[in-house]
């Protein structure tokens, strides 16, 4: 029996995908199993060449809340995300990468907060990193520790992007007012750019609970310092800001990164010793 669609969903969940056959089904299930059910799922395939589309179409046939679109391959996630928003109807927009997972209460916690706090444009939650992670990974960027979370624009600029895209719920009006994601081919930090645009005039809030399982792949860790420097420089020029994290990248100091990561690893082990990792909610799959 096909699950019928909510005619007036409050939340639109946007999932871009490309060759995601390995994880896409679990990702979609983690949305379908939410305790909060007033949503639609907008999936936009960016020209997959594997079995991704067949998997999605099978799920779409069982649940009318799933709406599937296919576009020509762009190679830039900002394009299918913006396309998905245009096809959606919810008052709130959530983004979910095709290999990440949500916990069961993610949408409920966030929608309740935005309903009670009209002055807040978007909320984000903490994330738990899993997948191809090792001690060689940049732990500073991965660990979901609340002491390094940005809570305002100043924090974003000072600390860098601590907001996992899959953890965000944003008001449609706020998203559209800033023009959505930057689709410029030179823009490689489109999520960070979006938070910076929103925070120029709007407030955001951290919900200190783990609501996202953020999957890490070994290929995500690059030693290409020049490319990282280029991305940050572009963002600085685009938004006319100065990012301290850019200065750190320009130093290209492995020693400084190592010391920084060891400090954060120590904090992580302390959190683990008090049950931080074990007591988290599980994915809704």
Q: PLM features: residue spans?
A:
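Conserved nucleotide-sugar donor-binding catalytic segment
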Residues: 86, 125, 142-231, 235
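Acidic helix N-cap motif at the loop->helix transition within catalytic regions
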Residues: 22-25, 50-59, 101, 105
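Short aromatic/hydrophobic "clamp" motif used to bind/position activated sugar donors
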Residues: 93
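A conserved acidic beta->alpha catalytic loop
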Residues: 30, 45-54, 73-74, 97
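Conserved donor NDP-sugar-binding/catalytic core segment of glycosyltransferases
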Residues: 105-139
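Glycine-rich, basic loop-to-helix element that forms the pyrophosphate-binding segment
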Residues: 71-88, 109
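N-proximal low-complexity "stem/linker" segments adjacent to membrane-targeting elements
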Residues: 1-32
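The conserved acidic donor/metal-binding loop of glycosyltransferases
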Residues: 97-101, 126
């Amino acid at each position: 029996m096909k699950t019928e669609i909510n005619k007036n969903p409050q939340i639109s969940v946007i999932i871009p995908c490309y060759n995601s056959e390995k994880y896409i089904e679990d990702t979609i299930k983690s949305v379908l199993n939410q305790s909060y059910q007033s949503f639609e799922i907008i999936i936009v395939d960016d020209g997959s060449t594997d079995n991704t589309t067949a998997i999605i179409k099978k799920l779409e046939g069982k649940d009318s809340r799933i709406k599937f679109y296919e576009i020509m391959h762009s190679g830039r996630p900002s394009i299918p995300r913006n396309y998905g928003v245009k096809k959606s109807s919810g008052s709130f927009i959530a983004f979910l990468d095709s290999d990440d997972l949500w916990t069961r209460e993610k949408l409920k916690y966030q929608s309740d907060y935005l309903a009670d706090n009209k002055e807040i444009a978007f909320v984000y939650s903490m994330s738990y990193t899993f997948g191809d992670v090792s001690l060689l990974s940049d732990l500073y960027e991965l660990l979901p520790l609340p002491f390094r979370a940005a809570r305002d624009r100043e924090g974003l600029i000072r600390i860098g992007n601590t907001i996992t895209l899959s953890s965000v719920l944003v008001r449609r009006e706020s998203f559209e007012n800033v023009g959505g994601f930057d689709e410029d081919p030179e823009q490689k930090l489109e999520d960070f750019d979006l938070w910076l645009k929103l925070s120029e005039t709007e407030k955001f809030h951290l919900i200190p609970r783990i609501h996202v399982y953020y999957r890490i792949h070994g290929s995500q860790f690059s030693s290409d310092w020049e490319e990282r420097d280029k991305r940050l420089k572009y963002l600085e020029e685009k938004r006319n800001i100065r990012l301290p994290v850019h200065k750190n990248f320009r130093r290209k100091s492995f020693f400084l990164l190592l010391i920084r990561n060891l400090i954060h690893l120590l904090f992580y082990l302390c959190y683990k010793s008090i049950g931080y990792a074990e007591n988290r909610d599980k994915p809704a799959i």
